[in-house]
Structure formats: structure tokens, C-alpha cells
From Swiss-Prot:
Glycans are attached at residue 424. The keyword ATP-binding does not apply. InterPro entries: K+_transporter, K_trans_C, K_trans_N. Keywords: Cell membrane, Glycoprotein, Ion transport, Membrane, Potassium, Potassium transport, Transmembrane, Transmembrane helix, Transport. Residues 38-62, 177-195, 241-273, 318-347, 417-426, 477 are extracellular. GO terms for cellular component: plasma membrane. Residues 1-16, 84-155, 217-219, 295-296, 369-395, 448-455, 499-781 are cytoplasmic. It comes from Arabidopsis thaliana (Mouse-ear cress). It is a multi-pass membrane protein. This is Potassium transporter 8. Probable potassium transporter. Belongs to the HAK/KUP transporter (TC 2.A.72.3) family. GO terms for molecular function: potassium ion transmembrane transporter activity. It is found in: Cell membrane.
Length: 781
């Protein structure tokens, strides 16, 4: 299932109906697996203990009415028709909403923000709109957010809470989905046998599921959609059969009047049972979170014309069967499989297990994606990210997270041993994410859509009231399983916030202790300091977008030598999902031209994939060569903190892999196997006996460069032949004396523990390990 090929991010003017329908079909397997399997456990969880099924049928009809209107109002109205429109350049999810708010309110959790970042083509959605059209409440809200750091932190914490609950759902969804699917075995064996078989079978399936993650889903992705489609056809067909066979008048229960009768009769018990009913919308958030792989129209079509009617028919069919079967042999027989005709139970069981695995797979890969986004935005320690597909950028695998999820999932399964407690936990996680989305959407309506605050108030009041009602019913089950997502979210939130706090403090230290450019120019201009310049290119990795990092002076102090070409490289994330390759690099000079000092800023979106080290090196060198050739600052921002008064002018330079009309680089071992076109101008040097590699820059046919630029390119060629060395800081952060106890605990213990147990500073920066030198420094923050 090649989602990348049909992705709306590709430069297609308008998707054809065939493309839209194909995407809608594929979305069944990626987006709706979790939502489609909810009929397996909704009725069973609802009637677990709070309410009982009586001969009046008021309970079963009231529950059916609640399910119908919940499915209609939350997934259909809220998500399909409203929330899906709040995409971040085609991307969805909690971080997409947070990113939109950060850009429109000009706030950011990323410390190294630049005004030049606002020139990115994806930075402003609907950039043609006049910002003066923002209404008075919008201006007031925008100014309030910009002025108060506390509110910015609260907005970040709110987004992180939603993210942590999604991670918690990644633990609970596989457990409850597989548990409910396997529960069909209870009808073919005694209760004594069943209690010894069910848990081991569930654990075996879960272990197999998590063990296969490193292979990636692209190899089996093509069967996901057929499995979910077969499941939807199965439950809808069984539903239609049960409706006509047992109770054709069950449709009357769709009236809201039955909700009133249900709550009037059951009162507090009915309210407490809402925690089971809300499971009918579990997986709805995936419609928005997975928007980046599809289009709004394809997801809307798939839900409106396939998923929604199938689920309604399935729930109506179960209610029709139960309305004629009031005396059940055992408590656990209120469930999905009891309404399945006995002749087809085994095939349905097989399809249900496959559908549960597909639904679990979707939430697991979604958890991987969220962790990657958090890492990109500096809110999670660096972890190993493996790209399992060269064609589909979203297919990733994170070993540490995978095994952690598996252990937690097995612990939940073995610890609870039934769906009642797991459903209580899953319900709280699901409704919390939806509440966070509702809160963020109300801000998006005012700040991004520039609507009246009345629309935002109406949105948060209507949907917030429904969700708060479900949230309260889930929270009351805190001691009966609902504590699990709270505990998991608290742990992950603590990890994220401590890491983010430590990262900010480390950056503040870098800013306060950066070296004066005058010192650097004096160092380069003096011949009496014993500083030796060696062949090659020295790349100084730093998070600073201006100034000279302290690690460079620390390096020079201990090793008085530097390369003939020095590049201060900053690889940073920006609050957009993707940065176009032609806008990736910002290149400028540091000091006079003859010193061969450059600054290069590589910008990535929170969903971008970092290139491998060889391609990144070539793009970096070609961007500098293109800057030398053009030497005309296009988009630049002066550095207000420059202590020498020399402005660093930064030019947007396209990566060589995407700019065929720019400077191209050719490298070989001197055997002339690959010769550039004779119509292009070639900058090269005579083969040197010291270096085996030969480097040539091929300029565009129309390129005209002066003598000094040609000399500079020649020197860059010589330096590239000599090789590149990457120098980066390895920080040891400590709280300064006099800090509060909480700060000392957070920095000296929390952040230090996370730093020591996460990937090193060079990981994920597209730098070759063999050419990397780490400079240790102690940061007193």
C-alpha cells in the first residue's frame, strides 16, 4: 500500500475521483481499524456491572440510542465536518493543532526561532489573508498568549497531555482489541477452560504483533484494507440479519427519547455506564492524526459511506438480538459473539482477530510517529528511529518504544485479565485526547480561522459538554482500571517536560556564553597565537543560529588548530510539518570573505525525514558552493545580538538533490568514471598525491562567476577532498548553586538520567560517526 505515491503532498493539482476513492479504500486499513473493532466490546463493557439487561428493553434501547448519537455527533459532526478542516498543510493530530497555534500567535516551544522561518512557504496557511482581518477577540487572545510565558507553558502542557494519552492508548488498545476478539472462544468451551486459555492466547498474539514491528507494515499493508473491509461487511451483514430476524422495529430506539427513558430509570448507574458507551468512538482521533497520508475528502468518504453505516447496523443488530434474549446463561454472554449465528462463529472469530491486529497496528505505528514528532520539537529524549521503507516516509520503527509498549501491554493484560478494567482505562485515555482536541480547536477557530469568539464558545460548549459528561463517567472508575492511563500519562508527561526544560536551559547557557565574533576574527587574523590551520572542512554543530558557540573556543583552547574551511552548522526543527528541499538551507558568512567561515542552518519540519550522512554532506557542501557562486543574499535576517556589529546575512539555498539548475558535486577516486557534461563549467583542482578522493563542482551552463568566487570554490574543493570533520558538544548539565530544590532534582537527576540513557548528540543529525569528534562541556544552568 504505497501511501507516499498517492499522498496529497505530492505536486498534484487536483486529485481525480479514482485517486480519492483509492485513498478512501486504503484509509480503511490505516485509519479505521480501531474504530471498526469497537462493536466487539462496547455492549460487554457497558453491561459489565453498572446496569443490567431487563425485559422492558429500556436499558438496551437507551444504550443503542446513546451509541447512535455519540457516533453521529463526535466522529461524524465534530471530526469529519469540523476538525479535519484544521489541518497543518495536510497534516493532522495534536501537534498539528499546536503548531498552527504557535505560528499564528507567534509563540514557539523551540528556542532557536528566526524571523526567516516565517518566509517558509508552509509556515502560513492561507498566507494570502490579511492579518488585519483578525477580529478584536482574536487580537486580544493573540497578544495575551504572546505576553504571558505561563500561558504558553500551559498550552504546551495541554498538547503534551493529549500526546501522552495517545501513547497510553497505544498500550491499552492492543490489549482490549485482541482480548475482545479472542473472547469468542468462550462460546466453544467451558468457563473453567476458557479462563486458562484466553490470557495465554492474547499474550501470544501481542508478543507476535510487537515482535514483527521491525519488519515494517509496508510489506503487509496491502492486506490491511481488505481485512477491515471484510470485517465491516461481516458485522453489517450480521447486523441486518439480526434486525430482520429478531426485531425489525429496533430502529425506533434511535430516537433521543430512549436516552431520556434510560437515564430516568437508571439514574446514577446509567451515568456510570457511559464509560463503556464511549468506547464506541475509540479510534476516532485517528481520522485526524493520520490525515497526512490521505486527503480530507477520502477520509470523509470512507467514514460517511462505509464505516459509519456499518457500525450503526452492527450496534442495531446486537440490540435487536438482545431485545429478544433477556435470560442469558452467564454474565459474559452479553457481548458481540452471542449475536453471531452459530454456523459462522469460527470464520467471524478469525476475521475479528485479524481486524483487531490491524487496529492495534495502527495505534502502534501512530505512537511511533508521535514520539518522533516530540523528539523533533525537543520534547522527548533522542531515540533510535529506523525507517522500514524507502518509499513511505511515515513508516518508522522505534525499538525502545516498541518493547516498552509490549511490556506494558502484557502487564495490563495479565494484571487485569478481563476487558472490564481495560475498557475503563481505555475510555479515559480516549476521552481525554478528545477533550484536548476540543480545547485546541476552540483556539484555532479564533486565531487561525479568524472567526468570532462566539463560534469558539459554541464549539467548546456543545462538544465539551458531551465529552466532559463522558470524562466524568470514566474518571469515577479511577480505582477500577482508569488509573492506568493517568499513571502512564503522568510518567510520559514528566519525561517530556523535564527533557524540554533541560533543553531550554542548555540553550540559554549557550546563548549567554557564546563567544564574541571579534574574538574569532582576532584569532583567525593573528599569526602569533600558534594556531595551525589544517586541510579539510570543520563542521561545528551547534544549536545557535547566531554567534559562536562556546564549544568552539573550548576546542581551540585544548587543541590549537582548525580547518581551512569552517562551517557553523545548526540543524533545527521548525513548527511546520515539512520543509521543502529548496528552502532547507540558510547559508551566510561569518566575518570577512577571506577567512572562509560560513554559517549554515538546515531546517526540518516535525514530520521530515533526515537524510543519510553522505547525501546530507553533499547537500551541505553544494549549498555553500551555490552561496559562493550567487553571493547575493535573497532572504536574510540581521542578527540583533551580534556583538561585533557585523550582520550575518543568510541566503536561502536549495539542496543540490532538489536543485538541478544549481551547483552539483561529483566525487570519485580519480578514475574519471563519471564525467560531467562538457557544456557545463567545472571547478576542480589538480589531483593531489595526499588525497585519493577527487571532487569537482559542476556549475550551470549560464553561470558566470568572478575571480574571487572561483578561488573560493577551488579552496572549498580542496578542503572537501581532504575530508570533513564534525565537531559537536557533549553536554553535562548541572544546576547552579542556589537553585531551588525542584530545579536541582529536575536537572541534576531527571535530565541527567534521561541524557545518559538516550542516544548521543550526534544521533539523528545525519553526520558520519567515523568523522565525528565530541567535545565535553559542563553546563551550569
Amino acid at each position: 500500500m504505497d501511501l507516499e505515491r498517492l499522498s496529497p503532498r505530492n505536486p498534484v493539482k487536483k486529485e481525480s475521483w479514482w485517486t480519492v476513492l483509492t485513498l478512501a479504500y486504503q484509509s480503511l486499513g490505516v485509519v479505521y481499524g480501531d474504530l471498526a473493532t469497537s462493536p466487539l466490546y462496547v455492549y460487554k463493557s457497558t453491561f459489565a456491572e453498572d446496569i443490567t439487561h431487563s425485559e422492558t428493553n429500556e436499558e438496551i434501547f437507551g444504550v443503542l440510542s446513546l451509541i447512535f448519537w455519540t457516533l453521529t455527533l463526535i466522529p461524524l459532526v465534530k471530526y469529519v465536518f469540523i476538525v479535519l478542516r484544521a489541518d497543518d498543510n495536510g497534516e493532522g493530530g495534536t501537534f498539528a493543532l499546536y503548531s498552527l497555534l504557535c505560528r499564528h500567535a507567534r509563540i514557539s516551544s523551540l528556542p532557536n526561532f528566526q524571523l526567516a522561518d516565517e518566509d517558509l512557504s508552509e509556515y502560513k496557511k492561507n498566507s494570502g489573508e490579511n492579518p488585519m482581518r483578525l477580529k478584536v477577540p482574536g487580537w486580544s487572545l493573540k497578544n495575551t498568549l504572546e505576553k504571558h510565558k505561563f500561558l504558553q507553558n500551559m498550552l504546551l502542557v495541554l498538547a503534551l497531555i493529549g500526546t501522552c494519552m495517545v501513547i497510553g492508548d497505544g498500550v491499552l488498545t492492543p490489549a482490549i482489541s485482541v482480548f475482545s476478539a479472542v473472547s469468542g472462544l468462550e462460546l466453544s468451551m467451558s468457563k473453567q477452560q476458557h479462563q486458562y486459555v484466553e490470557v495465554p492466547v492474547v499474550c501470544a498474539i501481542l508478543i507476535l504483533l510487537f515482535s514483527l514491528q521491525h519488519y515494517g507494515t509496508h510489506r503487509l499493508g496491502f492486506v490491511f484494507a481488505p481485512i477491515v473491509l471484510a470485517w465491516l461487511l461481516c458485522i453489517s451483514t450480521i447486523g441486518v440479519y439480526n434486525i430482520f430476524h429478531w426485531n425489525p422495529h429496533v430502529y425506533k430506539a434511535l430516537s433521543p427519547y430512549y436516552i431520556y427513558k434510560f437515564l430516568k430509570k437508571t439514574r446514577k448507574r446509567g451515568w456510570m455506564s457511559l464509560g463503556g458507551i464511549l468506547l464506541c468512538i475509540t479510534g476516532s482521533e485517528a481520522m485526524f492524526a493520520d490525515l497526512g497520508h490521505f486527503t480530507q475528502l477520502s477520509i470523509q468518504i470512507a467514514f460517511t459511506f462505509a464505516v459509519y453505516p456499518s457500525l450503526i447496523l452492527a450496534y442495531m443488530g446486537q440490540a435487536a438480538y438482545l431485545s429478544k434474549h433477556h435470560v442469558l446463561q452467564s454474565d459474559y454472554r452479553i457481548g458481540f459473539y452471542v449475536s453471531v449465528p452459530e454456523q459462522i462463529r469460527w470464520p467471524v472469530l478469525a476475521i475479528a482477530i485479524l481486524a483487531a491486529v490491524v487496529g492495534s497496528q495502527a495505534i502502534i505505528t501512530g505512537t511511533f510517529s508521535i514520539i518522533k514528532q516530540c523528539t523533533s520539537l525537543g520534547c522527548f529524549p533522542k531515540v533510535k528511529i529506523v525507517h522500514t521503507s524507502s518509499r513511505m516516509h511515515g513508516q518508522i520503527y522505534i525499538p525502545e518504544i516498541n518493547w516498552t509498549l509490549m511490556l506494558l501491554c502484557l502487564a495490563v493484560t495479565v494484571g487485569f485479565r478481563d476487558t472490564k478494567h481495560i475498557s475503563n482505562a481505555s475510555g479515559l485515555a480516549v476521552i481525554t485526547v478528545m477533550l484536548v482536541t476540543t480545547c485546541l480547536m476552540s483556539l484555532v477557530i479564533v486565531l487561525c480561522w479568524r472567526k468570532s469568539s462566539l463560534y469558539a464558545l459554541a464549539f467548546i460548549f456543545f462538544f465539551g459538554t458531551i465529552e466532559v459528561l463522558y470524562f466524568s463517567a470514566s474518571l469515577i472508575k479511577f480505582l477500577e482500571g482508569a488509573w492506568v492511563p493517568v499513571a502512564l500519562s503522568f510518567i510520559f508527561l514528566l519525561i517530556m517536560y523535564v527533557w524540554h526544560y533541560g533543553t531550554l536551559k542548555r540553550y540559554e547557557f549557550d546563548v549567554q556564553n557564546k563567544v564574541s565574533i571579534n574574538w574569532l576574527l582576532t584569532l583567525f587574523g593573528s599569526s602569533n597565537l600558534g594556531i595551525v590551520r589544517v586541510h579539510g572542512i570543520g563542521v561545528i554543530n551547534t544549536e545557535l543560529v547566531s554567534g559562536i558557540p562556546a564549544i568552539f573556543s573550548h576546542f581551540i583552547t585544548n587543541l590549537p588548530a582548525f580547518h581551512q574551511v569552517v562551517v557553523f552548522l545548526c540543524v533545527k526543527s521548525v513548527p511546520v510539518p515539512h520543509v521543502k528541499p529548496e528552502e532547507r538551507f540558510l547559508v551566510g558568512r561569518v566575518g570577512p570573505k577571506e577567512y572562509r567561515l560560513y554559517r549554515c542552518i538546515a531546517r526540518y519540519g516535525y514530520r521530515d525525514v533526515h537524510k543519510d550522512d553522505v547525501e546530507f554532506e553533499n547537500d551541505l557542501i553544494c549549498s555553500i558552493a551555490e552561496f559562493i557562486r550567487s553571493d547575493k543574499p535573497l532572504n536574510y535576517s540581521p542578527d540583533p545580538e551580534n556583538e561585533s556589529g557585523i550582520n550575518e546575512r543568510l541566503t536561502v539555498v536549495a539542496a543540490s538533490s532538489s536543485n538541478l539548475e544549481g551547483v552539483q558535486i561529483y566525487e570519485d577516486d580519480g578514475s574519471d568514471k563519471q564525467e560531467p557534461s562538457s557544456s557545463s563549467e567545472v571547478i576542480m583542482v589538480a589531483p593531489s598525491p595526499r588525497f585519493k578522493k577527487r571532487v569537482r563542482f559542476v556549475l550551470p551552463e549560464s553561470a558566470r562567476i568572478d575571480r574571487s568566487a572561483e578561488e573560493e570554490l577551488t579552496e572549498l574543493t580542496e578542503a572537501r577532498e581532504a575530508g570533513m570533520a564534525f565537531i559537536m558538544g557533549h553536554s553535562y548539565v548541572r544546576a547552579k548553586s542556589g537553585s531551588s530544590v525542584m530545579k536541582k532534582i529536575a536537572i541534576n537527576f531527571g535530565y541527567d538520567f534521561l541524557r545518559r540513557n538516550s542516544r548521543g548528540p550526534c544521533y539523528g543529525l545525519s553526520t558520519p560517526h567515523a568523522s565525528t569528534l565530541e567535545v565535553g562541556m559542563v553546563y551550569i544552568v
